[in-house]
UniProtKB/Swiss-Prot annotation:
Catalytic activity: (7R,8S)-7,8-diammoniononanoate + CO2 + ATP = (4R,5S)-dethiobiotin + ADP + phosphate + 3 H(+)
Family to which the UniProt record says this protein belongs: Belongs to the dethiobiotin synthetase family.
SUPFAM superfamilies assigned to the protein according to its UniProt record, in alphabetical order: P-loop containing nucleoside triphosphate hydrolases
Superkingdom as given in the UniProt entry: Bacteria
Protein name: ATP-dependent dethiobiotin synthetase BioD
Subunit description: Homodimer.
CDD domains in UniProt: DTBS
Function: Catalyzes a mechanistically unusual reaction, the ATP-dependent insertion of CO2 between the N7 and N8 nitrogen atoms of 7,8-diaminopelargonic acid (DAPA, also called 7,8-diammoniononanoate) to form a ureido ring.
Annotated residues for binding of Mg(2+): T17, R59, E111
GO terms for cellular component: cytosol
TM region positions: none
Stored NCBIfam families: bioD (TIGR00347)
């Protein structure tokens, strides 16, 4: 059976989809079979028809295997989008699909919507949070963060919330990194030191993203030894 990793972030619009694509392409280059699951998707892509993340995975990253489950047009928190569209989000169905994928792939990357403290739905008089799903099904997570101003607070508070919810963080991945900016350099070092987590990737700020650019970054990630480091943490051999 394969391993599942939940790709979460310190917020929305920080590039989880880009980072997830790089990880998927790198692991495939190492001979692993990889699937990406985006269980809850809200908001449309630039074409005004497709759903944003699925559009990205299929048409930009061109991953061999990616899928979603709940698609909702309003670009808002899943619980509100579900209420407005009459959608019933069932975490048990997501878990069943995830188990099905784990039977068929070495690694399944599950991309969340926003961060850990995002409600999927309301049930039994309470909100069912993203963190509830990770805890209920014992999913380890990678924390994707920006490296710009404000990143320290966002990363530290997210990690504290994860710890309080009993969620295991495997490591950190930084996105939109600007090497010439001292604040970016120091934020990466400071966050890693404060959280005592390994830095598994530092993705530069990209003016434009294409499949070729993603492949280049994936190869660089492999050459740095970070892909194998992640697999070692998971106990997956290559």
């Amino acid at each position: 059976m394969g391993q599942a990793i939940f790709m979460t972030g310190t917020g929305t619009e920080i590039g989880k989809t880009v980072v997830t694509s790089i990880v998927a392409l790198a692991l495939e280059r190492l001979g692993m079979s990889v699937s990406v699951l985006k269980p809850v998707q809200t908001g449309l892509a630039e074409d005004g028809v497709s759903f944003a993340e699925q559009y990205w995975y299929e048409r930009v990253a061109k991953l061999s295997a990616s899928e979603g489950m709940y698609y909702m047009e309003p670009a808002m928190s899943p619980h509100l989008a579900a209420k407005l569209t009459g959608t019933s989000i069932e975490p048990e169905r997501v878990a069943e699909r995830l188990e099905w994928l784990k039977q068929r792939y070495d690694v399944v990357l599950v991309e969340g919507a926003g961060g850990l403290a995002v409600p999927w739905c309301e049930r039994d008089g309470r909100f069912y949070m993203t963190s509830d799903f990770l805890r209920d099904y014992q999913l380890p997570a990678i924390l994707v963060s920006l490296s710009s101003l404000g990143a320290i607070h966002h990363a530290v508070t997210t990690a504290a919330y994860a710890d309080a919810q009993g969620i295991r963080l495997l490591g950190l991945m930084f996105n939109q990194f600007q090497e010439q900016e001292i604040i970016h350099q120091n934020n990466v070092e400071t966050i890693a030191a404060l959280l005592r987590l390994p830095v598994l990737a530092v993705v530069p700020l990209l003016p434009a993203v294409s499949r070729r650019e993603l492949e280049t970054l994936a190869q660089h990630w492999i050459e740095q030894g970070k892909a194998k480091q992640l697999l070692e943490v998971l106990g997956v051999g290559v």
